[in-house]
Structures are given as C-alpha cells and as structure tokens.
Amino acid sequence: MCTQTPARLTRGFPLALTAFATLLSIVEPAVSGAQDTRLDPRDTTHSQKQAPFFTKKDAILAGSFVAATVLMFPLDKQAAHALQDSSTQTNRFLKHTTTDVEIITSPGAYIIGGALYAVGRLGKWDRMADLGWHGTEAVLFAQGVTTVLKGAVGRGRPFLSDGTDPGDYHPGKGFSQADYTSFPSGHTSTAFAAAAAVTNETTRWWPRSVWIVGPLMYGGATAVGLSRMYHNRHWGSDVLLGAAIGTFSGRKVVQYAHGHPNNRLDRIMLRTTVVPDGRGGVSVGTSIPLP
C-alpha cells in the first residue's frame, strides 16, 4: 500500500504541473499588470514612476517555485518511471507531439523572436519589435543562468541510470560533460522565459489578453517541460526549477525594459532604422549611445 502511494501521486504529476502552469498564466501576468498600472502600455519611450523591482508578490511566487521543486525531489524517481511506462512511450501522439514542441522551443524561440523583431523594425510596428526583442532577451538571460547552474550542479540525466538515481550529482562535471547537465532544464527555462515575456508584453497594451495569451503560452511551456521528462532527459525537479528561472527572466526583462526605456540595449535595438536602399535591398542604421 505504502509503495503504491508515491506512484499514484507521480502519475498525476503531468496534470498537476499543467494545472499549476494554468494558474500561473493568469495570476502571474495579473501581478505584473498591477505593478505596471502607472506605465504607458504603448511603448518604452516614456519614463514614469515605477513600482519596486522586486515585491512581496515576487517573493511569494519565488517561494512557491522553490517549495514545489523541493517537494518534487523525493518523487523524481517515481515520476520518471511513470512517464517511461511502456503504454506512455508507445503512444504515437505523444511521440510526435513531444518532439515537435521541443523543436519549436529550441531553436524555434530564437527564430520566432528574431523574426518578430525584424518584421517589427521593417514595418515600424513598435509593439511587435518590443515583443520580439524583449522575448529574445528573456530567453538569452534564462539560458545564461541555466547554463551556469547546469555546469556547477553536475546532475546526471535520468537515462544514465534508467531513471533510478536522481541523486547522481558531480559538482562541476556539467561544464565538461553534457550528460551531467540535467539540473535545471534548459528547454523548460527557454519555454517559460518566452511565455512570461510574451504574456507580460502583450498584457501591457491588451490587458484582457491574459485570459487568452497566458494559458496558451504557459500551457505550451508546460508541454515542453513534460516532453523533456517523456524523453528521459530531465527529472521533474529539473523542470520545475527551469520553469522558475524562465518565468522570472521573462517577467523581469519586460519590467526592466519598460521601467528603464533609455537602457543601452533598447536604445540600440529598438531605435534601429531599416529602409529600402533602392537596389532591392535594405539599409540599416542605428545610433550607439555614449556612456
């Protein structure tokens, strides 16, 4: 009886994570929106009085992620076994879907972000350029944090032990061996960074979109995390911490960018001019702000 309880709990992990992400998709951008009510939602060209960069609500959100990650550690093995069950692994729909969502995330996040930025600059659609650039910034920041942690922690990926040893840590080994870069999940942090950036960016100028964009973006990000577990590349706790890093990266990049519209990167990237050169090409011009 006792040995079956963890299994029952972990079989429900995908549903629990999906429910958590759905709640996050609504609550998290609403929190950001409440902090930004005094901001001009249209662009980053006007500086206004800001709420504190980190708030009590941020602390609650971070604490929830940390608690979920810590609680997941003892259940990592059972969750891995549940998703590696033969009936799950032979499901054709899951096989194709999990592969597709991973490709959309990496390298898809960079391609989509870059395309939105380029189209926004070419068409002089500032909101689209903001969306593409800030989304890409968030993904890059999340990846930077994730990469350092992966290398430092050196946690073995589940397939090394056939999902039996979630405690396989070799600090520093992740910098030299990819098989020891399990914690946290890079695909998940990328997906949640993009989800948070897009959701928070769009709710600045379309507040009601939180009920549409939020569930779509965070739901997709959750699918990415579950796909990494399905492919036996990550433990459940890897996914949860990756989600935390990505969520905060997306939130804070957007908040900082709109709170500091004259920051150097935005002045360069969002004030670049792209015009036809008369020869079938384009001419790109920008100004480099001096210190």
Identify the residue ranges that each predicted region occupies.
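Short, glycine/alanine-rich hydrophobic alpha-helices that insert into or span membranes
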Residues: A62-T69, G113
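Alpha-helical transmembrane segments of multi-pass membrane proteins
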Residues: A68-A80
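Active-site-surrounding "flap" and adjacent substrate/cofactor-binding loops of secreted or lumenal enzymes
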Residues: A79, Q84-T99
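Interfacial helix-start motif at the membrane-water boundary
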Residues: R92-G114
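Membrane-helix interface/capping segments
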Residues: G114-A115, G123
